[in-house]
Structure formats: C-alpha cells, structure tokens
Amino acid sequence: MPILATTPQAQVRSAVEPLVRSGESPAPVGVIDLDAFDYNAVQMPTRSGGLPIRVASKSIRSVAALRRALEHEGYRGILAYSVPEALHLVGEGFRDIVVAYPSVNRKALRELAADDTARESITVMVDSVELLSLLEGSVRVAIDIDCTLHLPGAVIGPRRSPVRTPEQVSALAREVVRRGHRLVGLMAYEGQVASVADGLPGPVGAVKRWLRSKSMADLAPRRRACVAAAREVADIEFVNGGGTGSLQESAAEGTLTELAAGSGFYTPAIFDDFTGINHKAAAFFVCQVSRVPAPGWATVNSGGWIASGPPAKDRVPVPVWPAGLSYSSTEGAGEVQTPLRGADLEVEDLVWFRHAKAGEMTENVDRLLAVGHDGVDVWDTYRGQGWTLR
C-alpha cells in the first residue's frame, strides 16, 4: 500500500500560517503533524512480526520527538548514531541505547568509561580489534556484521563492517571477552533492502525488487550462522537489524530479536515508492515567499536542503503545498533562495516542502512546530539544544 497522505492537513496549515506570518516562528521552520506521527508509530509494529522496534534517533534528532515515539507500544530502546549523542541522551534520562556505528572519539569514550550510569545504559559498536583497543574499562559491546550482497563484480549495500563470516564473528567475539568487555549484542543491517524502494515501475523497479529478494535469501543462512557463532562465546541479549523499509522482511527471517526504525515516524519523500509502507507524511518544512520575479513565478528564501546519498532527483525536497509547484530547471532548490513555478503566490505566502530524508531536515532548524488537536507545541531539535550529531 502506498503512502496515504503526502500534503499537510488543512488544520496543520491553519495552525502554522499565523505563527509564520506574525514572525513568532519565522520561516524556514520545521513542522510535525502529530496525528500523522502517531498514526505512523502505530503502523510500524503491525509489520514487525511481534519484535520490538528500537528507535533510530538519527532519523528524529529531537528529544521531545524521541519521547513521544517511545510512548507508543511496540518500541524499546534507542539506536543512536554516536557515543557523544548517546551520552547526551543518557543526560536527558534515556536508557538502553545502542550506538549503531563504531566510535574513534577518544574523549567521548573516556567519558563513557568514567560514568557508571552511561556504562550500564550504552552499548558501543565494534567491527575490529583496532576499535576494541580504543575502549577503556569494561563496557557493553556489540559486533556489527556485514550484510551486503556480493554479486560478480559488484557489492550491493552499505559498506559497513569487515566481519562477514561466522569464523570472523567468533574470533572478534572471543577478543571482546578476553579484553574484559561484555559482548551483549549483534547488529546486522540489510541497508540494500531497508532503503531500496520496491514499488517503482518498469525495468528499474523489477531489478530493485529482485535485489531485495536476492539479498534476503543470501543473507538469511549467513546471518543465522553468525548469530550462532556469537552465542557460543557470550550470552547475547539482542540481535538487531532491519529498517523502516524492511520491517516485515527482516522480522520474517527469524534470526533477529529486535528491529530498528526511525524514518517511519516522519515518513519523508524517499519512502513514497515503497509498497508496504501505508504511512502519512508527518514532517514538513515551511518557507516563505520573498519575491515574485515574474508572472507565474515565486521565490522563497532558503529551500535547498538536499539529502545525503548519491546525487539524484530523489534527494531534493519536494514542494507539496500549494499543489503544482515545480523548480526552475536552471536553478533547482537553492541555498539562499528557491524559485518555484506553477501557483499564484504573493510575497509572504507560505510554501510547504517534504524533505527527501528524515532527520536531516532538523539540522537546518532550531525547533519543530508540533501541531496536534490541543494546539501547537514547540519541540527543540538537537540543533536547538546547541549540538548536532558528531
């Protein structure tokens, strides 16, 4: 089932417009539709096969949004980006945090080692002996397992870990234990499934669907063997995998004890071509018209918040309200201004965009206007708290 709603609801627009026009919340500003956010939060566990979902904080980047996500049934713990982020979240009262990526931040690792609460709350990720050598004291450790699909002449998927075989898992697991750390988990993320749309038409869509299917078939026995190898060495608390775009496929394999998802709460534009995601767009950013350079054109300040990944059309923000807007073919979405064509707009009018990805939108705003039935709440982003992912 495709995305159910891609434009802001009328009540959301009417709540935000006076705040922007009055200057109380100057544009550009981020907006969260709480009805859609909560709807999406309810939908994801219906695809998780009964497995708990760890909330991927990098896709949310707001403490208030994280709290709301974790209030919903079916969610447990946080999947953080970095040790500094995890330490910050512990300071905010969160516990059960797995850091999804290895850290070489010696200062943060020293802070982790010196803080009893942090050591019990945070699990760090490793994929090599070199990373183990950076750890001090005794900390909770998880091993990252490579889940890429290897085809003749090509590797499909995110290049993450060098640990690919059960033998490699066993060797690194034994080294974790030998050095006095606690091996508590495994991560095995199949990014080439979770982030590859399966609903595109034509030959491109057919190839992507085949890659998703082939990836899961290739990964299942290898991931199962890697998990068994780790369990021979230590009492593993969790095996994490999956993402918003692969919850049902990842859960069905039977190897994982938990899933991860974060983007699904906001449901950015990059998920519009996934057939199994029946969500509603919950996150928008709003820019304001600052000039009308010619009939049929309107230019907004800012707008060019391009998403990470291979440069392509699907990394560009989508103007979704008013309907029918399009970019200039010679300018596109700009850093300081964005010309748009296709609507009868005037100076000070609002234009609503969807970012291509989820958490990256928040790097551009200090706060989010969270619009619900009871009015508008203001949620600080990480940036609004004075820090960013690092």
Tell me what each language-model feature is.
Residues V292-R390:
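C-terminal accessory subdomain/extension
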Residues M1-A114, Q385-R390:
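A charged N-terminal "starter" segment
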Residues P201-A206, W210-K214, G245-A323:
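Active-site loop ensemble at the mouth of alpha/beta enzyme cores that anchors a bound cofactor
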Residues C147-T267:
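Active-site loop/helix belt of alpha/beta enzymes
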Residues S22-D33, D96-V99, T117-I122, V155-V163, ...:
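Glycine-rich tight-turn/loop motif centered on a GG-T
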Residues F37, K58, L89, I143, ...:
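Conserved, mostly hydrophobic/aromatic
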Residues A56-S195:
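Active-site-proximal beta-alpha core segment in soluble small-molecule metabolic enzymes
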